Amino acid sequence: MTELDDVRLETLVDALGDAASIGLPADIEAAYGGPFRLADRLVYANFVTSIDGVAALAGVERSSATISGGASADRFVMALLRAVADAVVVGVGTLREHRGPWTAEGAFPAGADRFRRARAAIAGTEAPTLAVVT
């Protein structure tokens, strides 16, 4: 049993089906639901929302965890994107509010070693740049 055993996603649409996988370890791609592909020179956004589109709850600390229910699949996707990102963009309010999961290890601690090795192989750096929007 590994830290990825409780994460099994399913790819619904693969718009980049002709593009090559970025080369993640097999267990990470299996948890993702297949090959992980990204187009070059694009900005990717990832956040959770409630059924009515709310992405943050006023006055609730770590409201995204409240909205997502702390689902390991959501944390896994966040970690995966951070493992391959050049930069993570965060608002200054979020930065001031709490220490966030700016790295893959922070987003999905159970997979820290796997994501750390994947990032080193793909990006060649320990962590993405943190870009703060003010």
Please describe what each predicted stretch is.
Residues T2-I51, A55-T134:
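Active-site ligand-binding patch in enzyme domains
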